[in-house]
Amino acid sequence: MEDFKTIACNIFIIWLTLVIVLILLPSMFGSSLGISEVYMKILVKVLEWATLRIQKGFKDKEKLSASNGIIQRDKSPMETEIECLRQSRSQDIREGDFELGDVFYFAKKGFEAIVEDEVTQRFSSEELISWNLLTRTNNNFHYVSLRVTLIWVLGLCVRYCILLPLRITLATIGISWLVLGATLVGQLPNSRMKSWFSELVHLMCCRICARALSSAIQYHNKENKPKKGGICVANHTSPIDIIILANDGCYAMVGQVHGGLMGIIQRAMARACPHVWFERSEMRDRHLVTERLREHVSDKSKLPILIFPEGTCINNTSVMMFKKGSFEIGGTIYPVAIKYDPQFGDAFWNSSKNSMVSYLLRMMTSWALKCNVWYLPPVNRQDGEDAVQFANRVKSAIAKQGGLVELPWDGGLKRGKVKDSFKEEQQKNYSRIIAGENKSLKPTTH
């Protein structure tokens, strides 16, 4: 029995030593021994082979579309659709008339919203073209060959018996180092030395945590990286976005107060660096945050602020409405587009269904975390441009660069009801049509 304990202890020491030497130390200093690159190449080959085997099970060889949508929507504005609807009738149409047949337009939109609206599908996992040997996330897939099944079983053993313990070890070290290091740094008086230690702790921790997720990150256009005194805004998929960005540089964070593990991390970070955490439901907190952000931006020696203007996590298929508050405080905006590859794992965090711990466990049992980060050129508010227009301009640039769908809807609809202002806007548009105030609707006769 003693011999068994000795052997187990020796194996554990050897394993931990290899983890520290081959993974932990290189990641702390931002270098790599090439192990992750080899793993990703093997993984890509396996998934390509599995995809080909799966496709042989289909009689129809047509290319599948990776889309969550089942409705082909007409993107034309209300005025154009109603004009086409009226032109399809035989009676005379005069400008400003009310037509009972217009009800078909609203009925069509209503049925589309009932069957599949544009908002709620953004809060569920992205549909995949083919099964990635993780979960059956593709509705079009119904066949698995015996070979693919055996590969899936082998992959299951690798992910849960080898990768999961390794990743939990790295994540535990990274988070513990952040909490302990930030707490110790927080005891130092405010000085350049404290800022230097704080940046070092944050950077090393994020690099360790990124390695714990087998991250393969490509950063593009590094010459546009956010600079001190600026505001970095990015699309939001999960809290891992912070690790992805902070792996390449330090930021002062702004975000919603969380409980549990996330809350512990937030409180530790706030001790060493002037991060801003607030309660979204408290109006007083929101005004206080705005003032603190203005003070932060005015000091060019402070770290750039990282803000996610959507205010909630979206499934990385689209970019939803940017809240104008981030664009009212002044300063230079540094847009950043983040796009994850769902083939290797689903990075989306549905906070209304999954706790932070369960989400991290799911990520640690995925194949890897592969994503691209684009630093876009810095922008400033133009003369005569209000905060809403500025926010929409930045949102459009991020959506275009990341290949994401741009949506006007508020991400707050994830938890709340549609605001009356959205309904009133549609009512006003139709009122202009029947009042003859809309010039785009031309009178026609048949």
Swiss-Prot record:
InterPro entries found in the cross-reference section: LPCAT1-like (IPR045252), Plipid/glycerol_acylTrfase (IPR002123)
Transmembrane segments: 11-31, 146-166, 168-188
Annotated GO CC locations: endoplasmic reticulum; endoplasmic reticulum membrane
Alphabetized SMART domains for the sequence: PlsC
EC number(s) reported in the record: 2.3.1.15, 2.3.1.51
Its membrane topology: Multi-pass membrane protein
Top-level taxon: Eukaryota
Catalytic activity entry: sn-glycerol 3-phosphate + an acyl-CoA = a 1-acyl-sn-glycero-3-phosphate + CoA; a 1-acyl-sn-glycero-3-phosphate + an acyl-CoA = a 1,2-diacyl-sn-glycero-3-phosphate + CoA; dodecanoyl-CoA + sn-glycerol 3-phosphate = 1-dodecanoyl-sn-glycerol 3-phosphate + CoA; sn-glycerol 3-phosphate + hexadecanoyl-CoA = 1-hexadecanoyl-sn-glycero-3-phosphate + CoA
Domain notes: The HXXXXD motif is essential for acyltransferase activity and may constitute the binding site for the phosphate moiety of the glycerol-3-phosphate.
Record family assignment: Belongs to the 1-acyl-sn-glycerol-3-phosphate acyltransferase family.
Name by which UniProt lists this protein: Glycerol-3-phosphate acyltransferase 3
Species of the source: Xenopus laevis (African clawed frog)
